[in-house]
Amino acid sequence: MQKLIMGNWKMNGNSTSIKELCSGISQVQYDTSRVAIAVFPSSVYVKEVISQLPEKVGVGLQNITFYDDGAYTGEISARMLEDIGCDYLLIGHSERRSLFAESDEDVFKKLNKIIDTTITPVVCIGESLDDRQSGKLKQVLATQLSLILENLSVEQLAKVVIAYEPVWAIGTGVVASLEQIQETHQFIRSLLAKVDERLAKNIKIVYGGSLKAENAKDILSLPDVDGGLIGGASLKAAEFNEIINQANKICTE
């Protein structure tokens, strides 16, 4: 399966640093039949990034509102997302859930706004360290996915990318073990198989939790890991490009 490598730039960068980053990423060579690339800059830089990256590199927003338009100061709608030419949308990132109290219902409502568009939604799910240590991992992930799996058709679900991000491994430098990553991705796929086995086989489930150049080969080689959602390492073109190179090699072997 084609690997999907995505960079979440979060609230980082300025016009100068982003221009340098885009220039660096533009140099990487990879087979587009084996690897797909996308980046998520801050919304104010999206148009700049689209113009500075090759067309083959997807660009997305980190968040939208579930309202269409109106008196919602500071918000960005799905219509605006399409209008500026975005290809992807992050939904339900752990930082949105923890810092801005986004609920599973909010995540579903945002997903529902774009599921029938050309935008590829990347739905983030993941557990806290307390959840894992108390044996609630499977319960938490199943709950986070329940509204989506119960209310979307198989055809709609096929458009979704799922990003598993253990909250305790984001921005901490702590990486889940290979066994933990594979077991969790396998469990997520089993939830999808209950809806449709072909869907479970073909949907992309990517890993997001301190993935970097030094561990990319091992993580991306796991059978149920279809790519990565990279944070800090995506802000350095050389490191992000090396992750892309590793993905390309894995899909070539």
Curated annotation (Swiss-Prot):
Keyword entries, A-Z: Cytoplasm, Gluconeogenesis, Glycolysis, Isomerase
Q: Which residues bind substrate?
A: 8-10, 171, 210, 231-232
The EC number on file is 5.3.1.1
Q: One biological-process term from Gene Ontology? A: gluconeogenesis
Alphabetical list of SUPFAM superfamilies matching this protein: Triosephosphate isomerase (TIM)
Q: Catalysed reaction per UniProt?
A: D-glyceraldehyde 3-phosphate = dihydroxyacetone phosphate
UniProt-annotated catalytic positions: 93, 165
Q: Does the keyword DNA damage apply?
A: no
Annotated localization: Cytoplasm
- GO annotation, cellular component aspect: cytosol
Q: Which GO terms describe its molecular function?
A: triose-phosphate isomerase activity
The record's section on Gene3D superfamilies has: Aldolase class I
Task: Name the predominant localization.
Answer: cytoplasm
Subunit field text: Homodimer.
- Per the similarity annotation, which family is this? Belongs to the triosephosphate isomerase family.
- Give the protein's recorded name: Triosephosphate isomerase
Q: Which organism is it from?
A: Francisella tularensis subsp. tularensis (strain SCHU S4 / Schu 4)
